[in-house]
Amino acid sequence: MRYEELDEACRSLEHLASDAEAEGEDAPLIPDPPGAVSPPTSLSGKAVLQVILLCASATLTLDIGLTVVRAPKIRLFESILCQAYYRTHGNPLPVPMQNIPESQCKTKEIQSGVARLIGWQTVFDGIPAIFLAIPYGALSDSKGRRPVLLLCFLGLALSTAWALLVCWMQWPLELTWISSLFQCLGGGPAVATAVLEATIADVVPDDKRSTIYFQLQATVLISDILANPLSSVLMAHNAWTPCFLGVGIQALATVLLIALPETLDFAKGSRPSDASIYGCKEEEPTLRGCLAKNFRSIVSDRNVAGLVFSLLILTVSAESLDFLLQYVSQRYGWSIAQSAMLLSLRAVVEFGLLLVVGSLLLFTQSSGLRNPRQRDLLIARLSLGLIVAGLLILSLSPTVAPAILVYTLGAGFQPAIMSLLASLWKASNPSNLGSLYSTVAIILAVGGVISGPLISLMYRIGLSLGHGWVGLPYFVASGLCAGIAGVLLSVKLPEQEQKPRRRET
């Protein structure tokens, strides 16, 4: 069944390519929304397809490399802290670090130490994006998307390699936090995501963008479907094997980006001649001035501001899920390898969901039943409700499967929000889409810097209280997401866009 779904997704991409080739021959039956900016019609359909497939392939490869390393790295943290804990308490374990039984490492002191490492790593990982997202966004708007993506991918690979080197040498685990310095190359995952989304927005029209975002997110989920079982199998032999494999795969992802066409030239046809590389006039060329201008542009549009602020839900939910392997292992008595398999099952459900939703988007697009912006807003609101419910159930449920299922059903939130945000922004700011996404990356990084230590603290408090209190971080995350949800509910599209439109026959 999985191969049939992938084949269907590929046919959808081919359909997009044929549509792009035909744009110059047939006028659209429905005009674009007022002020909307579409990519130049001179861009061939094959080039569009090449950009989409290479973005998906490179991102998928990178995510596989990162995912393969995730579970064994936590296991290495546990083993090192476990060995130090028993040695400190006068009862050193008579086995090498890699052979320490996992059951010996579930004390609250050891688990609190692991949570502290993860929580503060989130803080340090967010700092490069906060200070470098705008400069790299400006670079992507002037020199191109591909150079920035190459730096991002290289920085992430080096960051992973440093953390594993610290574990291999058995240096103090706090030195793993230095891995964030390598993310100054490119700005880290937040900037990589922003530039990838800007790359897609360069070449994909407004009415097709959310469909492609859904299909790309579904494709990337293959990393969880494939990498977690692979990691679990390899961990049964040795925790180091999947770690070395993961670094190699991340390096391969960086090499794949060399073949990515530069999309900035395709988008320049829609740029006003008096705009500078990141939407700032010549009299306001400084980084501070450009950052202030981007924030003013966001705040001046109530809808854009509401969408950007609602993206903080992603940081809260993502940081809480960073503890999922540790949480499931601690609360439900699973091994780290078994917990990683649970993430694969979650990815299978999310993969199917995104393909189904993507197919529905293609149907509404072809039938003209719903305006793309109204459709994206509806999907975002429904997905948000499922995220809040899933986190709440995860904090209270005696079994993990129902909570993961409900949470996963909210997977459409990010692609719907980003598609709607790009559409609204390009209607009035066509010249600096990369800087918009970079500004969003800064906001998300700040959210991660705040929510990461908060979720870590809640988890450690839950561990100290014992029993059902270990679910405290997910209860808090659910409440925070519910509060942010009110902002998304306040977003109102212009009156003329709220009426569904049909194609004339």
Curated annotation (Swiss-Prot):
GO cellular component, one term: membrane
Main location class: membrane
PROSITE patterns the UniProt entry points to: MFS
SUPFAM superfamilies named in the record: MFS general substrate transporter (SSF103473)
A Pfam family reported for this protein in Swiss-Prot or TrEMBL: MFS_1
Pathway the protein takes part in: Secondary metabolite biosynthesis
Transmembrane segments: 48-68, 117-137, 148-168, 181-201, 216-236, 240-260, 304-324, 343-363, 377-399, 403-425, 439-459, 469-489
Record keywords: Membrane, Transmembrane, Transmembrane helix, Transport
GO BP field: transmembrane transport
Keyword hit for Nucleus: no
Induction of expression: Expression is positively regulated by the aspercryptin cluser-specific transcription factor atnN.
Knockout-associated phenotype: Does not alter the yield of aspercryptin significantly.
One GO MF term attached to the UniProt entry: transmembrane transporter activity
Membrane topology reported for the UniProt record: Multi-pass membrane protein
Family as reported in the entry's similarity comment: Belongs to the major facilitator superfamily.
Name assigned to this protein: MFS efflux pump atnC
Organism: Emericella nidulans (strain FGSC A4 / ATCC 38163 / CBS 112.46 / NRRL 194 / M139) (Aspergillus nidulans)
